[in-house]
């Protein structure tokens, strides 16, 4: 991975600037590096966020990983998912959405579970292979200036306070839901109106719990919808709807969390035995 040494005191130039080094930005940087395209990646944070977030990708993502020669490394970190079951309040099976357990036309399984920090580490470590790619951490973009045939990116080195700039043929915003790039270029974001509150509980099992099952489970409860997700290794996730007017401080108390995870509408033991 190359070093960006020309931005302090003079205008550095590169083909592409990627703002944000999450999964999308890191994957794009690997693809550009594969083709020898000079790329500068600017990432605000000093390290990868170490808590679970996204948990699922498909065979097309594995095909991309294969393209940049990271599929073999990733295979040891993922879990092939057999699908998802939808059940009612009593645990009665409403829909069995099975995912094939054989490789499809992309050459990979259709459904994978993953742990995002591990996945991001694979992608970011992969950047070290490409001399044309430079990653700068602790850098925050604050302005984009459109020229006739380029874009000037102005950013701050948060470690030193230095104000730097770089000219690129293209700028790609991979900076998440609150994207500064989206706002600076005036691109609208469609609001689909889903503003419900959910409690997300990520857990690591201390002992085998075979009754939880290998499928993810969507509990279609009239009283309190919930989701159970089978993650990688011993990782499991429960997502529980917070009802209108319900106090967030109360529902996050350990006794209340356990009660909701073990209620008939959100207990994977009930659904897996009934399914």
Residue ranges of each PLM-predicted region?
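Conserved FAD-binding catalytic core of PHBH/FMO-like flavoproteins
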Residues: 125-126, 133, 150, 170, ...
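Glycine-rich FAD pyrophosphate-binding loop
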Residues: 33-53
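Conserved phosphate-binding and hydrolysis motifs of nucleotide-dependent enzymes
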Residues: 20-25, 169, 175-176
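Active-site-adjacent segment of FAD-dependent monooxygenases/related oxidoreductases
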Residues: 53, 58-128, 229-231
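A conserved short coil-to-beta-strand element within the FAD-binding core of flavoproteins
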Residues: 137-151
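Core beta-strand elements of the Rossmann-like FAD/NAD(P) dinucleotide-binding domain
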Residues: 12-14, 160-170
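Beta1/beta-strand and adjacent pyrophosphate-binding region of the FAD-binding site
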Residues: 9-24
């Amino acid at each position: 991975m190359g070093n960006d040494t020309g931005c302090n005191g003079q205008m550095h130039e590169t083909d592409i600037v990627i703002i944000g080094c999450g999964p999308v930005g890191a994957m794009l940087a690997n693809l550009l590096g594969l083709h020898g395209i000079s790329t500068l990646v600017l990432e605000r944070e000093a390290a990868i966020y170490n808590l679970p977030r996204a948990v699922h990708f498909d065979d097309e993502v594995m095909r991309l990983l294969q393209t940049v020669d990271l599929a073999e490394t990733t295979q040891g970190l993922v879990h092939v998912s057999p699908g998802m079951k939808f059940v009612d309040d009593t645990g009665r099976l409403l829909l069995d959405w099975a995912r094939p357990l054989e490789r499809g036309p992309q050459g990979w399984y259709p459904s994978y579970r993953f742990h995002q920090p591990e996945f991001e580490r694979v992608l970011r470590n992969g950047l070290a292979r490409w001399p044309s790619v430079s990653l700068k951490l602790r850098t925050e973009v604050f302005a984009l200036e459109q020229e006739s045939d380029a874009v000037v990116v102005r950013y701050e080195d948060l470690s030193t306070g230095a104000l730097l700039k770089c000219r690129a043929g293209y700028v790609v915003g991979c900076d998440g839901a609150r994207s500064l790039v989206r706002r600076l270029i005036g691109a609208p974001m469609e609001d689909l109106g889903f503003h419900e509150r959910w409690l997300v509980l990520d857990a690591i099992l201390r002992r085998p719990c075979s009754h939880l099952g290998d499928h993810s489970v969507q509990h279609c409860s009239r009283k309190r919808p919930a989701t159970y997700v089978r993650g990688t290794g011993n990782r499991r996730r429960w997502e529980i709807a917070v009802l209108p007017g319900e106090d967030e401080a109360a529902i996050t108390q350990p006794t209340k969390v356990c009660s909701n995870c073990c209620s008939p509408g959100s207990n994977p033991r009930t659904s897996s035995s009934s399914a």
